[in-house]
A protein has these predicted regions:
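N-terminal strand-loop-strand
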Residues: 1-29, 78
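Catalytic phosphate/metal-binding cores of nucleic-acid and nucleotide-processing enzymes, i.e., regions
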Residues: 1-4, 21, 31, 44-45, ...
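Residues that flank catalytic or metal-binding motifs in active/ligand-binding sites
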Residues: 4, 74-76, 107
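The catalytic Nudix box helix
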Residues: 29-63
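Hydrophobic pocket-lining residues within nucleotide cofactor-binding pockets
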Residues: 34, 116-119
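Hydrophobic (often cysteine-bearing) scaffold residues that line and stabilize catalytic clefts
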Residues: 40, 123, 127
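Active-site-adjacent beta-strand/loop module that shapes the phosphate/pyrophosphate-binding cleft
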Residues: 67-100, 112-117, 129-137
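Preference for well-ordered, secondary-structure-rich cores of eukaryotic proteins
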Residues: 105-106, 118
């Protein structure tokens, strides 16, 4: 059975919040695996808080559905449209991992807003494809 990640598209219609993945050469949306017994909406809210320190409420996000992401993982996307986007300078990551050298590092080490039309420049090919599909339905 495929794993499910839940993620948030935080946008004003032209720009999208992306997070720089520590140690990698690409950005990603705030997302993460849905734990056993966890609702995708709750997983999305939890992952956004862990990766950005943003507190979002269930009532203000729209469920965009589940999309085929990789061979072994699907992506359950949620949308938060805001005319005034939060300041990336106030964002921070409280979720860590241990790298190959044994150092404890944040999963995310930077934030920016990208133009939706430039998503292929910053995101992986699969993520750009899924977002393009989700936002055109």
């Amino acid at each position: 059975m495929k794993k499910i990640s839940a993620g948030l598209l935080l946008t004003d219609g032209a720009k999208l919040l992306v997070c720089h993945v520590t140690g990698r050469n690409f950005y990603d949306i705030p997302k993460g695996l849905v734990d056993d017994g966890e609702e995708p909406t709750a997983a999305c809210i939890r992952e956004v808080r862990e990766e950005t320190n943003l507190l979002i409420k269930r009532e203000i996000i729209a469920d965009l559905g589940v999309y085929e992401y990789t061979r072994d993982k699907d992506l359950h996307l949620f949308l938060l449209y805001r005319r005034d986007l939060p300041d990336t300078g106030n964002m921070g990551c409280s979720s860590f991992f241990i790298n190959k050298a044994g150092r404890r590092l944040p999963e995310v080490d930077g934030y920016r807003y990208i133009a939706l039309k430039e998503k292929e420049i910053y995101l992986t090919q699969n993520m750009a494809r899924v977002i393009g599909t989700a936002l055109t339905i």
